[in-house]
Amino acid sequence: MPVIRFYDGSQQVYEHSVSLIEIIKNKKPSIMKSLIAISVNNHFSNLNTFIREDAFIEFVDQKNYKALNIIRYSCAQLLSYAIKNIWPLAQIATSNIIEDGFYCDIDFKRSISEKDLILLENQMKTLVKREYNILNKLISYSEAREIFQKCFEKYKVSLIDENIHCNSKVSLYYHENYADIDIGLQVFNIKFCKYFKLQKIGGVYWKKNKNNKMLQRIYGTAWTNKQELDKHLDYLNELEKRDHRKIGKFLQLYHMQEESPGMIFWHNKGWIIFNELQNFVRVKLKEYKYEEVKTPLLIDKLIWKQSGHWDNYKNAIFTTLSEHREYCIKPMNCPGHVQIFNSRLKSYRDLPIRMAEFGSCHRNEPSGSLHGLMRVRNFTQDDAHIFCTREQVRSEINDCIKMIYDLYSTFHFKKILVKLSTRPEKRIGTDSLWNESEKDLSDMLIENHLSFEYQSGEGAFYGPKIEFILQDSLDRNWQCGTIQLDFYLPLRLSSFYINEKNEKKVPVIIHRAILGSIERFIGILIEECSGNLPTWLSPVQVVIISITDISSGYVKELFKKFSDVNIRIECDLRNEKIGFKIREHTLRRIPYILICGEKESSSKKISVRNRQGHNFGMIDVDFFIKKLQKEIITRNFYQMEE
């Protein structure tokens, strides 16, 4: 008498063994049309399966939150099946699901093209129209091995040999006569896999080992219905339009080249943005009483060994030799700041010391992970290190939080998420010290009326931390700011101060970053604004365009007037149609376009329009300059409306 328990908490008792179809008819017959899978004791089962003992059953229809991944697992192996249909000699290595989609890695004699993606997608659609059932079979290790050996699928044989014990069963899924290793629960029938799109081709080493063969990876996305697929494709199109790499190239902000991977060649316009952002942070540093320092790019490897960075990060550290001495190209600023702190004796009266640097850091990131300004090998950290007593920690944390929000408020991100990472299993320091430190951080967040999420066990081994995550208008999260307590580094590098009892005491270090990396933050801003940066950050703030040659003298006069008050301005005297000029400078994301013709020249006024197409009409020059200067000085995120 099997007792069947259901996901909703109900149960049903049967007097004899019963098929899944019969259970469905008794429990929920209406679900049959939308049922994509059934899980019995957390394992996929066919509809004709008979249940002979107690079981836990879950019906998965298209509305179930698990449906999406089940469809994506199915599409991943549908893609493998399509590949084998078109290119029988191609070797399927692995397939799996990822966020928003799926992929398949293949070993093929030639490079796969965009045209091939269309061919494969059409083949997948043809297979879906057959509405075949997907079968799951458990077979022996030797049977599974033999199946893939006969098909010359060496990668599948390798996966079986390495991951499955010779006495174990192997779970295979069958798409018609095509067998593949079970990677996850799949749909009953391929008809539920209609809504997919193949997207791009990439490269990946077998088992992520650069000593192995490079495979070709085909990426796709899949959804439960057409509306969700279309919505996702629209989202991807919007991402492509906002891609900082494309916008950066079009606006001539920077470039990167093969001879210096992960390093940025800043052009004049991009460097203006960089410096404006850096100067803005400098204003805040002064306001919050930081001292700016500069530490060497090269520091003896011995320091990095003493600090512990060499043991933990040596694979990411560039090194160089000089006169039989090995140096590290700094991957971070903190050990250098400790050297400045240690350079002279400190009293408790000197603390807190807030030390900031725009440090040029280098990290040997894998070439495959490099991505425009977002992931580079050379970047500028806007971090700071606060050396303070234990009693000063709460006050300093509070000021750090205020400074971070003060600066972020200028950029009007959709939301700021806050996470508090607590003690990991492996850590230094006593439980009482961790209790006190975690309470310091949480109390300061609460005092500032900030909601936050705990990340249990995610803190560094040397102290808890707060992360500030910026959410953009496309709901993407960017982790930028951090406040990190550190009890470890000052101990490792022998830092101390003299307290009021004339005793040596080890200071606490607070690591504080706001933008994180200036380069990455510029990339985030470009994508958030689609290149339409606020006026104060725009490389060119105003362009004056002439209608005819008659007004060229007045254009030059205006150019000087704006330049004299440090407004970044260009003039366009080309003999082109006015509509052409306006469109060109709008595409260049220049905030304000001033139009000068005979009417403007004779009245000594200007016609103004912004890059959104709003026409202000003809206005007084000095009035406009005054309004523009106010917009720039206040670092207004939005343009003037009148």
UniProtKB/Swiss-Prot annotation:
Cofactor: Zn(2+)
One Pfam family here: tRNA-synt_2b
Catalytic reaction annotation: tRNA(Thr) + L-threonine + ATP = L-threonyl-tRNA(Thr) + AMP + diphosphate + H(+)
Alphabetical list of PROSITE patterns matching this protein: AA_TRNA_LIGASE_II, TGS
A molecular function (GO) term: threonine-tRNA ligase activity
Coiled-coil residue windows: none
Record keyword tRNA-binding present: yes
Protein's UniProt keywords contain Thylakoid: no
Keyword terms of this UniProt record: Aminoacyl-tRNA synthetase, ATP-binding, Cytoplasm, Ligase, Metal-binding, Nucleotide-binding, Protein biosynthesis, RNA-binding, tRNA-binding, Zinc
GO biological process: threonyl-tRNA aminoacylation
Subcellular localization(s) per the UniProt record: Cytoplasm
Gene Ontology cellular component terms for the protein in this record: cytosol
Residues annotated as domain TGS: 1-61
Binding-site residues, Zn(2+): C334, H385, H511
UniProt remark on cofactor binding: Binds 1 zinc ion per subunit.
InterPro entries documented for this protein: aa-tRNA-synt_IIb, aa-tRNA-synth_II, aa-tRNA-synth_II/BPL/LPL, Anticodon-bd, Anticodon-bd_dom_sf, Beta-grasp_dom_sf, TGS, Thr-tRNA-ligase_IIa
Entry EC no(s): 6.1.1.3
Chain segments carrying region Catalytic: 243-534
Family: Belongs to the class-II aminoacyl-tRNA synthetase family.
PANTHER family: THREONINE--TRNA LIGASE, CHLOROPLASTIC_MITOCHONDRIAL 2, THREONINE-TRNA LIGASE
Assembly information from the UniProt record: Homodimer.
Purpose of the protein: Catalyzes the attachment of threonine to tRNA(Thr) in a two-step reaction: L-threonine is first activated by ATP to form Thr-AMP and then transferred to the acceptor end of tRNA(Thr). Also edits incorrectly charged L-seryl-tRNA(Thr).
The name this protein goes by in its record: Threonine--tRNA ligase
Species of the source: Buchnera aphidicola subsp. Acyrthosiphon pisum (strain Tuc7)
